[in-house]
Amino acid sequence: MDLSNLVTIVIPCKNENDIISKTLDLLNHQTGISGVKVIVCDSSDDGITKLTLWDRLEYNMDYFDLHIMDGGLPARARNNGFKLVTTPYVLFMDADIFLLDSDVLTNVVSKIKTEDLDLVSVRLRSDNGDYNYVYKVFDVLQRLSMLVSPFCLGGFMLTKTSKFKEIGGFDEEVKIAEDYAYSKQIKRDKFKVYNTFVYTPPRRFKDKGLWYMTKLMIGSLLNKNNKEYFKDGKDYWS
């Protein structure tokens, strides 16, 4: 499958030199990745990440078509990246999402097309096995939440471009869980989470602590209709 005419990938990034390098290296191994537009929306100020990204671009190191744009908080960064999207689907990925299975993209894009869905996601697991029990608990909570409305996290969000335009993109007033705020606007029968796995370093659990992350997730669920709750960044990005 030639993905270049089907999907564009948008990745917010800030001060994640080694991580974004690994993410992009793994993207090079995806089946059908040749020519796919990959837009990294970077707001790094560490003096290293920007150089790494521009070196990749200058020396044409990737099979995909790399673009670099200004970033910001995830909602703004993703909306910026979307300005270059011309394909029928767009994949919003976090900078620390590792696609270890080389057929993840072709499989998921094929399914969203065949099933005519507006938004799909996949299962998350840690790249070293730590905290996987937390991800499994989240899987259960996500299934329960989906009885009422879609619940999607922004680590891996593949959405129909026309639907993204219809919704108006990510709400830039929202500082946390902008991905969840977007997914709530999708009809239940147009959303699905596939039993395909992608991997991520459990750095937020290590940096913020399990209790903080648990409170944030439960708080998001309990305040799903309270936009003011999500306007406060709650020190997540500090």
Q: How does the language model describe each region?
A:
Residues 16-29:
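Short, well-formed alpha-helical segments that are part of the catalytic scaffolds
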Residues 26, 41-53, 97-98:
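A conserved acidic beta->alpha catalytic loop
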Residues 35-45, 67-71:
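Short beta-strand/loop segment that forms part of the nucleotide-sugar
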Residues 69-85:
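Glycine-rich, basic loop-to-helix element that forms the pyrophosphate-binding segment
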Residues 90:
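Short aromatic/hydrophobic "clamp" motif used to bind/position activated sugar donors
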Residues 102-131:
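Conserved donor NDP-sugar-binding/catalytic core segment of glycosyltransferases
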Residues 124-129, 141-159:
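A recurrent flexible, glycine/aromatic-enriched loop bordering the glycosyltransferase active site
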Residues 176-182:
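Acidic donor-binding loop at a coil-to-helix junction in glycosyltransferase catalytic cores
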